[in-house]
């Protein structure tokens, strides 16, 4: 019972953090959460508390700590990249910083591209996908690269998802020939 109350208390404290919260307080709360997780590794709220560390860093807009965070699954990887991208997109105050922000955003989109290329299906990532696509990230060559990877893994569902992704976009850069080749890959599986 007491552990449930402590977990709820930690979760409530995370919700009060914002960009003006002193770093010492943010770090102390993060340490408390990590200690609780370590001491109560089988607690039913463990996943929620692990997520609350991520939420804490986003609320505090602590990009350095976010960069050090190692997500343990694809969904969290996408969430971390999205948070980093949102923070970089909102930090456009000075000209010198804009160049740095652009480099950081490009690096984030490059990480996203690697996830897109190497995974059949990604969790909801509309903001990153849109930014990546609008900057010319998804080329015909990359579509073929992903299709070959999926074909090599005998991933018929992944090829189907990729083909549907092509159908969804109006005025897509890809031509009908790419879609036809994807269809052939699917037929071979």
Per-segment meaning from a language model:
Residues 1-189:
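Alpha-helical solenoid repeat scaffolds
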